[in-house]
Amino acid sequence: MVESTDFYFQWHITNVCNNRCKHCYHEDYDKKNELSREQLLQIADHIEDALEKWDFYSSASITGGEPFTRKEDLFVLLRYLENHCERIAHYDILTNGILITDKDISTLQTYKKLRRIQVSMEGPTPASHDAVRGDGDFLKVTNAIKKLKANGFVVSVMTTLTKNNMELIPDLIQLLGELGVDYFALERFMPEGQGGSNADWTLSKEETRRIFEYMTEQALQVKVPHLLLYRTLYCLCSDDVTVGAMCSAGVSALTILPDATILPCRRLPIPIG
């Protein structure tokens, strides 16, 4: 298996989602212009052809919406990536986790290129998490994490950082360690889509810096979960612009939307294909 890759695709296979998270950057949650199963496989072929032309190997994140809302198509696509896309070296699934059944876990265990499953958590307690994702979601997500870990999957957790949960990050890291989560990352809240009505959740520059300085410090101490630092903020935390990496949008990464529109980045809505 190829260990390192030259390129990255974030592939949104659907806008449909079973949640309506209050910070979500999506606005539309319907199937309008969603690609068919056959078209998804054609896109996979186009990706493989492009990577071969560039002489690149790629990783991919398969997401939505919620990808498990079309799980039959998802599993067909993953099997196709396994058997027909040599240049896509490995992939992750980004999900809220709550639609994954025992049968799905058995299916997922057959995919050799599946590197990790990323689920979302917004806080270390039912109150802090469910306030964003809906009543009862915290219990469903923690149960999903436990089940995935018990079956040998590498699990990462992504948290959207807001004024509401920024002081809860230390407790969340502790909880994730107890759950055996392998990786943890923070994403800054951007008041777009559903989140546009909650613009007051946005952190100030000073608050952002303080949290990421804390994450940088903790990354040297906390082993479980491994803290994935937001690369473009290294310079923010160190005042050294030579540390870290520049944004990869359009350089070593692309986003594919459910209707096959190509963007440099999901947060940069400028169609380039």
Regions picked out by a protein language model, each given a short descriptive name:
Residues 1-115:
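Conserved alpha-helical substructure of the radical SAM core
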